[in-house]
Amino acid sequence: MHVLSNPKHVTWLTQMGLDQIGEAYWQLGVPELVEHAIHNSEGVLSAEGALVCSTGKFTGRSPQDKFIVEDEKTRDTIWWGPVNNPFDSKQFDALYEKVTQFLQGKRVYIRDGYASALPEYKLNLRTVTTQSWTNLFVNNLFLRPIDKELTKFSPDFLILQVPEFQADPHVDGTKNANFTIINFTKRVILIGGTGFAGEIKKAVFTVLNYLLPQEHQVLPMHCSANVGTDGNTAIYFGLSGTGKTTLSADPNRKLIGDDEHGWCDKGIFNFEGGCYAKTINLAKESEPQIFDAIKFGTIVENMRFFAGTRTIDYKDSSITENVRCAYPLEYIPGALIPSIGSIPKHIFFLSCDAYGVLPPISQLDKDQAIHYFLSGYTAKIAGTEAGISAPKAVFSACFGAPFLPLHPTRYATMLADKLEKYEVTVWLVNTGWIGGGYGIGKRIDLNYTRAMVTAALSGELAKAGFEKDAIFNLSIPNACPEVPTHILNPSNTWNSVKEYELEAHKLMEAFASNFALYCD
């Protein structure tokens, strides 16, 4: 639809200071957006029909360039610090004006969508982008209104994303030329200087992480979720690379969502309408559902083709390790639509432990669950970042610190209340190393991890009984179907028990130092 044909749209554009734009396209269909992207030289089609695009200079988020406008609404509520940088409200107004002036005479793509599959918590989103592929990304990742809903659509938040606009840090108050700024009072997300579409997704997640606990007492969670044929829901918390998307894409269970959910008294619900999966080393044998979702309508970011073909080389990380694809949830066979589940029966905390000292799976009591939730532990390994030559413990509160506008203890308290109220079993799963740390041991077989998760869900682990780990005081199952018993206790897999204990105590000390941040 050409925007200038609709008086209602013209009125809105005028109110937002966008009335001087040039060509404007509202709610284009997927085929039209793909055509525009190819015509605009934004991307090309792969052999499977997916749209392969480059995000430009930025191939990931820039957390240090994310800001929240500090005003009366946010001054005493935001968890200010390295995660949430304050931005002056007057400087925001000036920068917004500069961005809208920059758009004069330029082509834009506008899309209405919403977050939250549960209607009572719906957040209507209107996104304005300068690139058609980014508009397709928004279509794939957020929930898609039907025609009847569009006629009455009124946005709760405006997202304005202009990669071509470069801020002047000395004048505009940013740290660099790129920025993501959230204004809760004016309900605007302003993004400039970066073409990485994931900034849009995570800015909306940050908004929900602020609004839902304060206005609705809903716990927002950085987790994936699925449900079994018996109706039992499970959720999987984890940082990037821990297996959150992989483990939730189970052919024997229906996928609710792969990344962002809310937990209310009715159950859990997906915030999104799509998935944003990593594709580095993707193989049909190990992740068939994700592999088959890469087809027409899907976006693939920063991937290369095999020479002389349009076949994607999933092993090519020459642009970035953070290669991803964005597709609608419906592209996963058997996905649960609408994506709403019951109160979870099981929670899995996924940690990629590169020290090789955490058990492959262990059961947590309520106090341990809150401890590990606040810790949000995983590990970086040598080679993943400049300057990392040995495993490094990484703690990200609630398994999602970069997206938490409120203090982590606010979310931890909400989780503790739910663990008290409902019968939920919490598990810690090590998807990392066994038999020694990185460089000595080996990464645990994905098939073993799947078998342990399946046994936890079916009750087989509980039937087998548990033994207490001597260092971490974790409850380790005595047996698990399809998994060698000797690997269940990590001390059994090391050549030297003494070396195991030394490394385990190092990790314990790192946990203690990090947890001290929340003890006051």
From Swiss-Prot:
Localization terms from the record: Cytoplasm
Cofactor(s) essential for the protein: Mn(2+)
One cellular component term (GO) for this entry is: cytosol
Q: What class of enzyme is it?
A: lyase
Cited Pfam families: PEPCK_ATP
From the UniProt record, list the reaction(s) this protein catalyses: oxaloacetate + ATP = phosphoenolpyruvate + ADP + CO2
Residues binding ATP: 202, 222, 238-246, 287, 324, 443-444, 449
Any one GO molecular function term = phosphoenolpyruvate carboxykinase (ATP) activity
- Presence of the UniProt keyword Metal-binding in the record: yes
> What is the protein's given name?
Phosphoenolpyruvate carboxykinase (ATP)
Naturally occurring in which organism (per UniProt):
Amoebophilus asiaticus (strain 5a2)
